[in-house]
Structures are given as structure tokens and as C-alpha cells.
């Protein structure tokens, strides 16, 4: 019976280094969501959207106006349908 490490000394060293890296990474990760930066404020949500994202960039105020205009157009169409149904 041989008492040497399976795979040799290099494999043992690689295992030790991998374990040390794993422990170091575990120590660096925050333990709670608040430590991770998600403290319940809306600023943490805004960090998810960066300028590096591809696609159409639209100001939030423009989106708000378009949404309100859409709601008003639906209401106007309902009113027109009711009025035209009573006239004709």
C-alpha cells in the first residue's frame, strides 16, 4: 500500500488553492440583502439599469405621458361608442 496522495503533490496543492479561493470568496460575499446593497430604497433598483444596455432609451416622463394618453384614448373610444349607439 502506498501512502502518497492520489494524483500527486500538484493535485493536492491545487485542491488546497481551490479551497482557499472558495473560502476567500465566501468571506467576501455579504451575509444579508441589506449588506448586498438592497436596503429597500429605490436607488438599488436603479442600479440594475445601466447605460450599457442596448435598446431604445426613453425618459420616464415620456412613458408616463404615453400611458396617460393611452388611458384617455380608451375612455374616449368608450364614450364615442356609447354616444353613437344612442344616436344611431
Swiss-Prot record:
* Region feature (Disordered): 1-41
Q: Report TM segments.
A: 61-81
Q: Name one GO biological process term.
A: intracellular protein transport
**What Pfam family is a match, any one?**
Sec61_beta
Q: Which GO terms describe its cellular component?
A: Sec61 translocon complex
UniProt subcellular location: Endoplasmic reticulum membrane
Cytoplasmic side of membrane: 1-60
Repeat keyword on record: no
Q: How does it assemble?
A: Heterotrimeric complex composed of SEC61, SEB1 and SSS1.
Name the protein family.
Answer: Belongs to the SEC61-beta family.
Protein name from the UniProt record: Protein transport protein Sec61 subunit beta
User: Which organism does this sequence originate in?
Assistant: Kluyveromyces lactis (strain ATCC 8585 / CBS 2359 / DSM 70799 / NBRC 1267 / NRRL Y-1140 / WM37)
Amino acid at each position: 500500500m502506498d501512502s502518497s496522495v492520489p494524483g500527486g503533490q500538484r493535485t493536492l496543492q491545487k485542491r488546497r488553492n481551490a479551497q482557499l479561493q472558495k473560502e476567500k470568496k465566501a468571506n467576501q460575499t455579504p451575509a444579508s440583502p441589506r449588506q448586498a446593497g438592497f436596503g429597500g430604497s429605490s436607488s438599488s433598483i436603479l442600479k440594475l439599469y445601466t447605460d450599457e444596455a442596448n435598446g431604445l432609451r426613453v425618459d420616464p416622463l415620456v412613458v408616463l405621458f404615453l400611458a396617460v394618453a393611452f388611458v384617455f384614448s380608451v375612455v374616449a373610444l368608450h364614450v364615442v361608442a356609447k354616444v353613437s349607439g344612442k344616436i344611431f
